[in-house]
Amino acid sequence: MQAKAVARTVRIAPRKARLVIDLIRGKEVGEAVAILRHTPKAASPIIEKVLKSAVANAEHNYDMDVNKLVITEAYVDEGPTLKRFRPRAMGRASAINKRTSHITIVVSEKKEG
């Protein structure tokens, strides 16, 4: 059985979020939370929140044991891009892309043995 949590349209660039999500993929939940707490990246608290949501979903919806949970899937997809303009010299303007992310974490109970 798998439990899933998704954070959609989070205001962080997918490239930056993937750096953090790669650290926790395949880890046990307790170890993953410890890694996220000690990772000095802006994506860390956001991903930790999604992970806690996935754990809560597993516990509440599927009656899974929290101590046996493992992150089976963790990925970041690109969300809609917010397009902004920055004024430049001589009346010009240049485009600024504010990228967003869809963060997905799937947890399941690890097999015995």
From Swiss-Prot:
Gene Ontology terms: biological process = translation
Tell me the disulfide pairings in this chain. none
Molecular functions (GO terms): rRNA binding; structural constituent of ribosome
User: What does the entry list under GO cellular component?
Assistant: cytosolic large ribosomal subunit
Keywords (alphabetical) are: Ribonucleoprotein, Ribosomal protein, RNA-binding, rRNA-binding
The family assignment reads:
Belongs to the universal ribosomal protein uL22 family.
Q: How does it assemble?
A: Part of the 50S ribosomal subunit.
Summarizing the function annotation, the protein's role is: This protein binds specifically to 23S rRNA; its binding is stimulated by other ribosomal proteins, e.g. L4, L17, and L20. It is important during the early stages of 50S assembly. It makes multiple contacts with different domains of the 23S rRNA in the assembled 50S subunit and ribosome.
Query: How is this protein named in the record?
Result: Large ribosomal subunit protein uL22
Its lineage opens with: Bacteria, Bacillati, Bacillota, Bacilli, Bacillales
Q: Which gene encodes it?
A: rplV
